[in-house]
Amino acid sequence: MDVFSADWPGICRRIVAEQRAIFAATASSEERTVYEGVGEGGDHTLAIDRRCEDAVFAELEALAAQGASFVAVSEERGEVSFGSGGETRVVIDPIDGSLNARRTIPSHSLSIAVASGPSMADVEFGFVHDFGADEGLLLRWHRS
């Protein structure tokens, strides 16, 4: 399966639904300020960050099970190859605005970019969901 022919709108909707459930289950600042380990970038990882990233990776694993090959790049896990890896990159930030999410300030988002190569200039699909406004933006670039 080609990564770019995947149902990215559906994938993103499922991730948003799972993350909403995670935020609802950890509604207080105390529940959201639990640390667990250190991420790939060297920062301490909030449990809520890890759980939201797990929701993204569950969808990526399902995509790989359908035969897609790509490399996921995340703050917590670093680079993770799926299938044969290759040039395609899926760049994720499961909680952009972790401090706000931790403080239960509804100004944080989910960001996903899918690129045909190693550079952000290679991005062909992008998605951002703002949990405060509960709005998402999905873009596809068509190169000529």
Task: Name these PLM-found stretches.
Residues M1-I92:
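N-terminal subdomain of lithium-sensitive/metallo-dependent phosphomonoesterases centered on the IMPase/IPPase/PAP
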